[in-house]
Amino acid sequence: MEGFRKIEWAERYMKVLGKIREQFRKERPLEGFTVGMALHVEAKTAVLVRTLVDAGAEVAITGCNPMSTQDDVADALRESGIACYAKRGMDVEEYYEALRNVIRAEPDIVIDDGADLIFLLHGEMESYAEKVKGASEETTTGVIRLRAMEREGVLKFPVIAVNDAYTKYLFDNRYGTGQSAIDGVIRATNLLMAGKIVVVAGYGWCGRGIAMRARGMGASVVVTEVDEIRALEAVMDGFRVMRMEDAAKIGDIFITATGNRDIIREEHIRLMKDGAILANAGHFNVEIDIPALERMAKAKREARKYVTEYDLGDKRVYLLAEGRLVNLVAADGHPVEVMDMSFANQALAAKYIAENWQKLERKVYRLPEELDRMVARMKLESMGVEIDQLTEEQVRYLSDWRCGT
């Protein structure tokens, strides 16, 4: 079965998670715990699910995006006895009903991506929140929502911001998104990147990864930003930086990666050249103003799989993957080796919650640094890389304020 083959391929290259899985089989740290998950249901995620099951957990899972599930992987999970409610192409009601089904499993620990599951536990399904010992959140967008909830004092349980771990955002967000977003654009369009003007909206870790990889493929990259420091970084990194109003006039391919809404609006679309391509690498489909495109269009059609052509009368523009995550809808998401670290963090976060939930407050926490650094060490070991250690004299030097000129 294709789904099982995909999972086995991912397992082969997820060596850090594999080591943790071996440890979990012996220790069974999640024995007696139910884990409710909303993640992109594809092969790498399935390896995490298997790891949690080997740790003793009961698992219920659904997708965190209506379009990102790979049905053959979801089928493989169900065939393995996992309560999996995900399917590709859900409408909004089906999507939320699947989330409700996960919550009805009465999870002790929640693993979320985008915070939709956690949000439901603070709304219509809040009666189930009492049983939740803690949660972890995978992505920047979700952490932004959760920190807002913490500020307002409404969080009902502690949350570990796995996204904020160094071994997550420095690698997953930058190298993972950088490669997979470009992969999604290329798979959807079959067009050449070299010589194109690629406009990257946002210069956070995701945006800088996309900009880096687009330049590496020969594109001329323009960055748009609202943050002065990030804009200055982009300039110093050698990219052109300008307002979206100006970039709209020259761009061939636009990729949004901001975690905010209305980045590409009607006034920008009107300025674009014929054949402009719009793609989104942010979690939700709100970065490109799709309702504006629908209003402006005289006609629309499917030009290719994952490519919608909008005829605006004087020109055509192309929207990829319905404005959803282009890397997961039109491609396979992040590279396996990158998700090895991200999901190692998730597995360790679940264990940490199981062992420490009684000590944690209703706050958003970073993953403990010792776990973060352990993942880095394990990754280096899996790659055959050795590094130096500080000598005793060096340790003393770094801690002694008396040492000077």
UniProtKB/Swiss-Prot annotation:
GO molecular function, one term: adenosylhomocysteinase activity
Function: May play a key role in the regulation of the intracellular concentration of adenosylhomocysteine.
Chief site of localization: cytoplasm
Gene from which this protein is expressed: ahcY
Reactions catalysed, as given in the entry: S-adenosyl-L-homocysteine + H2O = L-homocysteine + adenosine
ATP-binding in keyword set: no
SMART domains attached to this UniProt entry: AdoHcyase, AdoHcyase_NAD
Cytoplasm found in the keyword field: yes
Pathway stated in the Swiss-Prot or TrEMBL entry: Amino-acid biosynthesis; L-homocysteine biosynthesis; L-homocysteine from S-adenosyl-L-homocysteine: step 1/1
Chain positions recorded as substrate binding sites: D113, E138, K168, D172
Protein source organism: Archaeoglobus fulgidus (strain ATCC 49558 / DSM 4304 / JCM 9628 / NBRC 100126 / VC-16)
Pfam families: AdoHcyase (PF05221), AdoHcyase_NAD (PF00670)
Gene3D superfamilies registered for this protein in UniProt: Adenosylhomocysteinase-like, NAD(P)-binding Rossmann-like Domain
Swiss-Prot/TrEMBL cofactor(s): NAD(+)
Stated name of the protein: Adenosylhomocysteinase
The family this protein is said to belong to: Belongs to the adenosylhomocysteinase family.
Family annotation (InterPro entries): Adenosylhomocyst_ase-like_sf, Adenosylhomocysteinase-like, Ado_hCys_hydrolase_NAD-bd, NAD(P)-bd_dom_sf, S-Ado-L-homoCys_hydrolase_CS
Localization of this protein: Cytoplasm
Manner of cofactor binding, per the entry note: Binds 1 NAD(+) per subunit.
NCBIfam families tied to this protein: ahcY, PRK05476.2-3
Enzyme class per UniProt: hydrolase
Binding annotation for NAD(+): 139-141, 173, 202-207, 225, 260, 281-283, 327
Keywords: Cytoplasm, Hydrolase, NAD, One-carbon metabolism
GO CC, one annotated term: cytosol
The EC number(s) this enzyme carries: 3.13.2.1
One Gene Ontology term from the biological process aspect of the record: one-carbon metabolic process
